[in-house]
């Protein structure tokens, strides 16, 4: 694979606090790409509830609170999270041969339930999101969304969150198998090269895929110190300045 130069916004340097005018870089901002977590708290407001329902379906007296689930999100894979919880509660030991079987059963049940539960979940767009996407639409900046979920619930959820006609493309697990390919396909469908796009991510663990696709990115997560908490007051002009600063500064990082 070609080594694509990737840049991301680092926590701790706040562009909106800078009094110096931003430098105009050689790349124009032609597209904004959001992962689904950047639109709403889909993990705690959707996946967490599906896991709790799956635990109950298997007779397990486990119920993840928001705070507990956020801690477990440090583990990248949902099977690791379930296994860690089962061991912590003494349901299975580290060497228990039934651990893998039970983890697989819980995750399979959760996957079936999430398709039905997600649209009924009480999910709201992050503050300022709709205003930013509307501004992008009116100024001619393309908007795309990528998700590891199924199209049957991702597409209607996006419409539920931001309305019809404002998002030009939605890439889901039905289209590609890896997060990096999701970003690449979204850019291809938007007609924008990676260097002319800005990605908004809703979780630190999604950083690597955006980096691998050669994208500059912003972390929007109220639960991560140093990250932007939401989109309140953010407009396309601000995104253009940030995009130029990211590329002109040469910031490169594998951590948010």
Where are these regions (language model features)?
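Asp-based, Mg2+/Mn2+-dependent phosphohydrolase catalytic module
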Residues: 1-24, 151, 156-256
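Active-site neighborhood of HAD-like aspartate-dependent phosphohydrolases
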Residues: 2-70
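Conserved SAM-binding loop
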Residues: 40, 143, 199-200
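An amphipathic alpha-helix signature
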Residues: 48-52, 56, 78-87, 111, ...
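Substrate-recognition element of Asp-dependent hydrolases with the DxDx(T/V) motif
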Residues: 51, 129-159
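A short, structured active-site edge motif that brings together acidic residues
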Residues: 66-71, 97-102, 164-177
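A metal-dependent, Asp-based hydrolase signature
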Residues: 72-118, 127
């Amino acid at each position: 694979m070609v080594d694509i130069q990737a840049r991301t916004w680092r926590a701790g340097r706040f562009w909106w606090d800078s009094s110096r005018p931003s430098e105009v870089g050689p790349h124009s901002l032609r597209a904004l790409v959001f992962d689904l977590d950047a639109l709403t708290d889909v993990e705690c407001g959707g996946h967490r509830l599906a896991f709790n329902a799956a635990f109950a379906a298997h007779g397990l007296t486990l119920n993840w609170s928001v705070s507990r689930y956020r801690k477990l999100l440090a583990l990248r894979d949902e099977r690791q999270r379930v296994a860690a919880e089962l061991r912590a509660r003494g349901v299975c030991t580290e060497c228990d041969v039934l651990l893998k079987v039970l983890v697989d059963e819980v995750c399979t049940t959760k996957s079936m339930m999430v398709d039905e539960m997600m649209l009924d979940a009480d999910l709201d767009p992050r503050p300022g999101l709709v205003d930013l996407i509307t501004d992008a639409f009116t100024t001619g900046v393309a908007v795309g969304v990528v998700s590891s979920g199924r199209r049957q619930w991702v597409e209607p959820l996006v419409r539920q969150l931001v309305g019809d006609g404002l998002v030009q493309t939605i890439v889901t697990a039905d289209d590609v198998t890896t997060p990096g390919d999701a970003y690449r396909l979204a850019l291809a469908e938007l007609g924008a090269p990676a260097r002319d796009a800005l990605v908004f991510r809703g979780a630190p663990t999604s950083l690597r895929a955006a980096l691998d696709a050669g994208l500059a990115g912003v972390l929007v997560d109220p639960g991560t110190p140093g990250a932007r908490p939401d989109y309140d007051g953010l407009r396309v002009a601000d995104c253009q300045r940030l995009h130029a600063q990211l590329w002109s500064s040469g910031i490169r990082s594998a951590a948010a």
